[in-house]
Amino acid sequence: MSPAPDAAPAPASISLFDLSADAPVFQGLSLVSHAPGEALARAPRTSCSGSGERESPERKLLQGPMDISEKLFCSTCDQTFQNHQEQREHYKLDWHRFNLKQRLKDKPLLSALDFEKQSSTGDLSSISGSEDSDSASEEDLQTLDRERATFEKLSRPPGFYPHRVLFQNAQGQFLYAYRCVLGPHQDPPEEAELLLQNLQSRGPRDCVVLMAAAGHFAGAIFQGREVVTHKTFHRYTVRAKRGTAQGLRDARGGPSHSAGANLRRYNEATLYKDVRDLLAGPSWAKALEEAGTILLRAPRSGRSLFFGGKGAPLQRGDPRLWDIPLATRRPTFQELQRVLHKLTTLHVYEEDPREAVRLHSPQTHWKTVREERKKPTEEEIRKICRDEKEALGQNEESPKQGSGSEGEDGFQVELELVELTVGTLDLCESEVLPKRRRRKRNKKEKSRDQEAGAHRTLLQQTQEEEPSTQSSQAVAAPLGPLLDEAKAPGQPELWNALLAACRAGDVGVLKLQLAPSPADPRVLSLLSAPLGSGGFTLLHAAAAAGRGSVVRLLLEAGADPTVQDSRARPPYTVAADKSTRNEFRRFMEKNPDAYDYNKAQVPGPLTPEMEARQATRKREQKAARRQREEQQQRQQEQEEREREEQRRFAALSDREKRALAAERRLAAQLGAPTSPIPDSAIVNTRRCWSCGASLQGLTPFHYLDFSFCSTRCLQDHRRQAGRPSS
């Protein structure tokens, strides 16, 4: 990869106010046209195709006979290109987009020179096609801004600045100056002599800068760089965090009548009056009349401060009026000074800035030109298709011909169908060590899952050892013989017996295998021997299967719990459940110095006292849970009885309720037991007369002899009884 090109050299900046008329940079000045080779300079004509005028001779020469041209060409702008990069850059130009819009509107197209002059002078009204340039209506102002936003984009070719003018002096230096400080607008084509004179006069002598945006106004009168007078206004006209002026908001939809909206409307009117009164004053009016340059920055919705209406301070067709071609901040006096300083700065280059920017552009790539492959013609394509069809036909006939020659040569091809099962358990880590599920399951489900997980884990280790060409029968073969051949040659029977017992949890078979020869070195070596490339031992297999009794027996027989598999996991970490892990902890409590339990990752011993405390804690938790459930059940039953009593009391008539209440009062006065209540369901008669809710612990609402739990029930009862609530 070639190194990145160096950045374009930075120009020297000099203020026009700091130069004298006989400064060296002004000696031998001349107006520079666009450099040859750029897209915008290759059109020495005044119209383009589609404009209804005669085509240029250059285009006729380019067109030639009616054949398919191999040149890169833009038919809209009548331009040719050397490579695709130049063509793509041309399609991004505002000039090309403008000509496309003009062609769609059946309007005359502009050449590169005309378009550059129109855009550099800011005379975009002619570009937009407006005929009435003297109209000062708000609709025309909106059209002007819309066209300006469309055609003044920053997607221009390298070194092309539409608002600047390029000069060259006798020393070979190139000077860039902003067009807006070189005198008023001129009808195209502009006279180079006037531009040179204005440049040598060191910028505008009398200049007025006006800016307005978002309730802010700033204006200043300059003589050179000296400030004659300045004024700023600020009114609250834009709602915070919305960014839209109140007047523009009202124009889009129904006006708001809030206090804030009314305040913003009042401030807009006040700001309009203040600015108009300021610019109509004697000092400002005289300055606007005598100024050689007027610089303006205002949004489309805020231009009514300066244009339109009675006594407008500015006229749209004024040749001294220029839009500020810079990005500006909030209108303040400091911003006015910054804008004037920026516009009156002269940039001096030692070489052509257009060519330098183009060469140093990251879009410029230097490539070796290779001869392109010649594209096949239609006749060649048809011939290729015929050859392919003939070849396919021969291939279809070849089996028939081959059947006859089979007997002669005595050669037969036998095809064998092989079924291959591809396992993907090695890609899933959870198959080796299942995740702990939060949902509680019964012991039968747990035992089945543990057994299946152990079989899947051991089967995965077997599949990792097998080559990819084995059939499904080899995959389904018993695990023992394969492990015997790999790890325990010479004693497969003992190995198979131990492995099968560990899988199934058969403690009796293990005792028979280990009891006759507890000190046999062969058995001791097999207890901690790895199972295949996975490095699983018998202790790993028993722990993964959740066989706690087998784990205890293997540990007592001498199995090493510190042996790790190929993934550096000891048997304790692959245990399927807590009971299996507890066997390691019990063995650690009985044999604290037998192994390095830190390496085995056993957290600590499990003593009988600890197990007793855990059992007691579980019993207490179980009893508390049972008591809590019984209490909740009693509470639910009580609430259900209360709801039933409430429904039955509310269903009684007023006469039955009065009789029941009188009976209760009489029984309370006499101290005698009350008679059974009908249906024996209404236990508490002190209830709301309307809804039947209990009044125990409440302060009831009364009227007459009735009691209610709320005013709503009281009003409902009165309405039902036909009595007014007042």
UniProtKB/Swiss-Prot annotation:
GO terms for molecular function: catalytic activity, acting on a tRNA; RNA endonuclease activity; zinc ion binding. A zinc finger (C2H2-type) spans 72-96. It comes from the Eukaryota. The modification Phosphoserine is found at S258, S361, S398, S533, S675, S680. InterPro entries: Ankyrin_rpt, Ankyrin_rpt-contain_sf, ANKZ1/VMS1, VATC, VLRF1/Vms1, Znf_C2H2_type. It is an enzyme of class 3 (hydrolase). One of its GO terms (biological process) is rescue of stalled ribosome. GO terms for cellular component: cytoplasm; membrane. It holds the Pfam family Ank. Residues 131-141 have a biased composition (Acidic residues). Changing R585Q: Found in a patient with infantile-onset inflammatory bowel disease; uncertain significance; decreased function in cellular response to hydrogen peroxide; decreased protein abundance; does not affect interaction with VCP. Residues 436-445 have a biased composition (Basic residues). Endonuclease that cleaves polypeptidyl-tRNAs downstream of the ribosome-associated quality control (RQC) pathway to release incompletely synthesized polypeptides for degradation. The RQC pathway disassembles aberrantly stalled translation complexes to recycle or degrade the constituent parts. ANKZF1 acts downstream disassembly of stalled ribosomes and specifically cleaves off the terminal 3'-CCA nucleotides universal to all tRNAs from polypeptidyl-tRNAs, releasing (1) ubiquitinated polypeptides from 60S ribosomal subunit for degradation and (2) cleaved tRNAs. The VLRF1 domain mediates binding to the 60S ribosomal subunit. Interacts (via VIM motif) with VCP. PANTHER family: ANKYRIN REPEAT AND ZINC FINGER DOMAIN-CONTAINING PROTEIN 1, TRNA ENDONUCLEASE ANKZF1. This is tRNA endonuclease ANKZF1. It comes from Homo sapiens. The gene is ANKZF1.
